[in-house]
């Protein structure tokens, strides 16, 4: 394994795989904050060259956190399909990138190969891709999952309806649900971020969400994004269960900072299978985001792209219905501006798909970032072109509870019409019965929530 290269007469030497992975990243403020970013564009190019020549085995055998020290590393390594790995272990990262982008390689071919990849290998591929590569490669890797709706089918584009309220006011939540439904949002999930994380409040909000779902016989699933243990307790006490949610991190220390253990995720999957109102086999929902490990002091000197890929390796083990990166939510300390946020969103999407998970993206930014709503619109169109499974939707994209800017209900409608995409098939049939959609297009009734009153 070579850890050095020569460019224009200058020798660039790296100490280990972790450093090569970090220096090969495109510039982002979080890596600068962590002290792991490339010191120059030349060093970045040199790291990309060294990384391109490394083999899949080189990187698998050198995880950024040792196997003996971290439960996430152990889970990722133990989940590798050894038959697939043996086929590709001598490929260079450049070979793997070319394979993913090759026109003659099918989605099924990639679906087999990705079983043999660890998360560090997945991250390595993203690091040597251009933005167009990230889009083209992501498009080739559909990941389809089933709850009450089917997500990820080619030609579809789904939306999480996000009716957050600063007081968990159930009337406000219901009103936002009706507005979102009138635009065709909500086929991924109707998911509320609660202000108060306790069983009683969670049950009250879930009852509101399912009150709407049941009244209008909507083929979707609900979720209140409290801590996983709160959700489990509420469901055991009789609250209506849809998807069970948890934010995850790419290291054991990061999970502990989130108050999470793998045993909790195991229990959530078991509870969901027993109690939840899900027609399909996928009942979990995870959120992630570049920089989360560093913000928790749990990145172990690794860069934020690699740590994000490890989130997806962890998620893959649980076969969730939904995973999305909340790409700009963590702030400019980690992704400084629209250029860095767009790059991260495209990286996260292809890394999720190459990990075999149902990948969405919250195209978003915080109010102190060097970004604006045009960023969100640019990113959502790029991601929809790349085959992203879903984005978020809320009134005008302004989340007054979480205090950040995301995408609006009408943005999903715009993308669908612009690119000829449709909701999940079960949800589209329901929209047709309500007179909101016909022949894949919104009708004149769309956008008017009064049709539910």
Give the role of each language-model region.
Residues 1-174, 182, 189-453:
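Anaerobic metallocofactor- and corrinoid-dependent redox/one-carbon enzyme cores
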